Amino acid sequence: MIAGVVTARNPGEALEKIKTSKFNLYEVRLDSFESFEGLEVLGEYSKKLIFTPRRREEGGIRPLDDGTRLSLYRRVMELKPAYVDVEFASDIAQEVMELAKEKGVGVILSYHDFNGTPDFGKLLTLLEDMEELEPEIIKIVTTANSPLDNLRVLRLYEHAENLIAFCMGPLGRISRVFSAQLAPFTYAPLEGEVAPGQLRAEELDRLRVMLFG
């Protein structure tokens, strides 16, 4: 399954993009919004939505402070989305997870490394630390500086269920194809490229079929 990544200037624009596309899930990048007025219009599709308000330091598109992000998490949780995404290292991660549990909303606990890929021992320790918080899904994304980095990340699938793991960057594209087969779902942009090395949904699915049938 593929989650379409939605970037937009406001909730209304995001809604129109969702209405005119055909994905089973959508990651709504709240950090791309210039305005949050009328956020509730997205409730129509809430069961298909992942809400992600990242800080700039976590790969966010626009700057968001933690107070604003917490407010956004509270607002979108009232819509009962499929998931909210929060970065493992974020100062508000624990609070977000507690709020999500109260509201019955799934959590994707994420880790991103925009510079490289740690050795496998460190990745496995990271995975175990993240599992202790008991999120519904763990997402580990690193940057491939060599083809072997893909193998280190993909080995994590042997140690966890409900895991999304792949590498960013041109050298990481093959791991995205494997994640389309091994993970509960993976990501593809509705338009452009939201993260380095992203593949369009059609290309991702074509390559997945070529490799796995």
UniProtKB/Swiss-Prot annotation:
UniProt-listed SUPFAM superfamilies: Aldolase
Reactions the enzyme catalyzes: 3-dehydroquinate = 3-dehydroshikimate + H2O
Domain of life: Archaea
GO MF: 3-dehydroquinate dehydratase activity
Family affiliation: Belongs to the type-I 3-dehydroquinase family.
Role, per record: Involved in the third step of the chorismate pathway, which leads to the biosynthesis of aromatic amino acids. Catalyzes the cis-dehydration of 3-dehydroquinate (DHQ) and introduces the first double bond of the aromatic ring to yield 3-dehydroshikimate.
The protein, known as: 3-dehydroquinate dehydratase
Organism for this UniProt entry: Thermococcus kodakarensis (strain ATCC BAA-918 / JCM 12380 / KOD1) (Pyrococcus kodakaraensis (strain KOD1))
